[in-house]
Swiss-Prot record:
Assembly notes: Homotetramer.
Function recorded in the entry: Catalyzes the ATP-dependent amination of UTP to CTP with either L-glutamine or ammonia as the source of nitrogen. Regulates intracellular CTP levels through interactions with the four ribonucleotide triphosphates.
Residues the record lists as binding ATP: 24-29, 81
Residues noted as binding UTP in the record, renumbered to the chain: 23, 202-207, 238
Keywords attached to this entry: ATP-binding, Glutamine amidotransferase, Ligase, Magnesium, Metal-binding, Nucleotide-binding, Pyrimidine biosynthesis
Gene: pyrG
Binding-site positions, CTP: 23, 162-164, 202-207, 238
Organism name: Rhodococcus jostii (strain RHA1)
GO terms under cellular component: cytosol
Protein's name in the database: CTP synthase
Amino acid sequence: MPQSRTHSRTATKHIFVSGGVASSLGKGLTASSLGQLLTARGMRVTMQKLDPYLNVDPGTMNPFQHGEVFVTDDGAETDLDVGHYERFLDRDLSGQANVTTGQVYSTVIAKERRGEYLGDTVQVIPHITDEIKSRILAMSGPDLQGHQPDVVITEIGGTVGDIESQPFLEAARQVRHDVGRDNVFFLHVSLVPYLAPSGELKTKPTQHSVAALRNIGIQPDALILRCDREVPPALKNKIALMCDVDVDGCISTPDAPSIYDIPKVLHSEGLDAYVVRQLGLPFRDVDWTVWGNLLERVHQPRETVRIALVGKYVDLPDAYLSVTEALRAGGFANRSKVEISWVPSDACETEAGAQAALGDVDGVLIPGGFGIRGIEGKLGAIRYARHRKIPLLGLCLGLQCVVIEAARSVGLDDANSAEFEPETTHPVISTMADQEDVIAGEADLGGTMRLGAYPAVLTKGSVVARAYGSEEVSERHRHRYEVNNAYRDRIAKSGLRFSGTSPDGHLVEFVEYPADQHPFFVATQAHPELKSRPTRPHPLFAAFVDAALKHKLEERLPVDVHGEERAAVATDDELADSADRDEVASVDSAG
């Protein structure tokens, strides 16, 4: 006779977030917002994403298919939802926060090859599901500081019914059995579509989605009803009855004004209080001090600033998700709204193209990327911003392009990166020594870049040191190429300063033009956007947006005491002289 199981109500609680009917309903933001609410109630929350694709990680996936790759401090290449988790929880997560089918199968097959299964026939159940469970339960262990989480929120990627998601859902069902029903909460995100011709909200898709979930042994405790409008009480009652969920657990979530309003929406519907009651968590009121201040800055900006994001993947904004969130957070730091102008880098290859694309912006951001496509356009945008004193921030590839443009401006006409032109006579950007076997095709491409957090030392009094308020910083990285130190002296003749390096001085981490040459022209080999939080904006982005605001204010026409406008722009002769200088510089740097 099997023994009865007893479970402690004080154990770490597990919340599983699944999705149904359609993808892109906002499971990640829902999970992040619930995590934020529980954190604001004084609980220690950690989060995890289970991705059903067979890739080991998203590091080699096409940005147009997957969006950005979010890098953690420990060097894991993870799903972009992990970025949402870090931003909403305001805490760093490890590579454990992202589990893929590829990782699970790789581990299980490796164990089989080592003979760890003692001759068993290896199957999806129990071997694959056991490996998934071990990774879920590992999140409930102490963190690096020795703190055990009160709650683990696990988002299950895909939708119910996907064949790829079934092992993860089965593992989640087994976790409930293993740790006790009182310690597990299932939250299901479903679509309630509105049919305009009939003027009705339809509940059948949600009913079918919940039925599919129940077929595999999971009864949801609460439903997130996604719709473009409020779900009326009568419909909530119907869904509660047909899906066997408490009415208090039917949460209407219409589209919010901003993603930062989602916690307020969930709280107003009582989701966090319902979860606390169901899991027996200690009840504390939500402390809105920090998040309320954020919402005030989101909805009551004093200024608006326009930033051009000159990128290669602008057709899919998710490819730059952390960059755009960091820009917006930089705006919050300055009580300003950042409007992003999405500029395909190809559009800036010519002076006329750059003028058309960048003529009305207050700042230019050059993000990371790979490959030669669009590089000349990035160089054109950099040249345009340098000549016209428009604030610029370069990230990763952005730094490399800034260095190439500076080198070309001092006579190294064919200066280039070994990534784009392996045979260039002036490889001002070269392959890192430990990456040469990868470039030669003699090692794996995935997971082999310089990944994770690395320290840097900043030059005292530099623009970046003033922005950070420190001369020692740590930032996350993801790259294979570096500034070629053999060209540092020649590049410095352009006025560009190498204002931050690795502690040993070998690897260039930051470059800038001094403040007396340009109001703000900074680039970094790192990805500082990955450490920005809406409630704690990254200092580089805050300084960049501040410079863009000052640039905007300087462009305005002041009014004298008699009410007459005084021209705050150059005279026609001065503009003509400037255009001549720009044309000469453009021809000189184009080679």
